[in-house]
Amino acid sequence: MKVSQAVALRIKELLKERGMTLYKLEQESGVLHGTMSNIMYGRNKGVTLSVVIQISKGFGMRYQDFLNSPLLDENNLDIE
């Protein structure tokens, strides 16, 4: 799985867990709708650490905790 796909799946997982909408996450994180849309629909080749940090803040968590998921385990990712 590509890193960008894993990030999108992690976002979906956390949105569901927290009963949060994507719109609310955009508002809380400051990530622009276009950027978030590109991540969620696989139109990005990659996701920068700065965007991951913003998204994490939108969830009210540290980016280390966002990345601490089996979805983002390096053994499951296609690193290009």
PLM regions: where:
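Short, basic-rich loop-to-helix N-cap that marks the start of a DNA-contacting helix
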Residues: 43-54
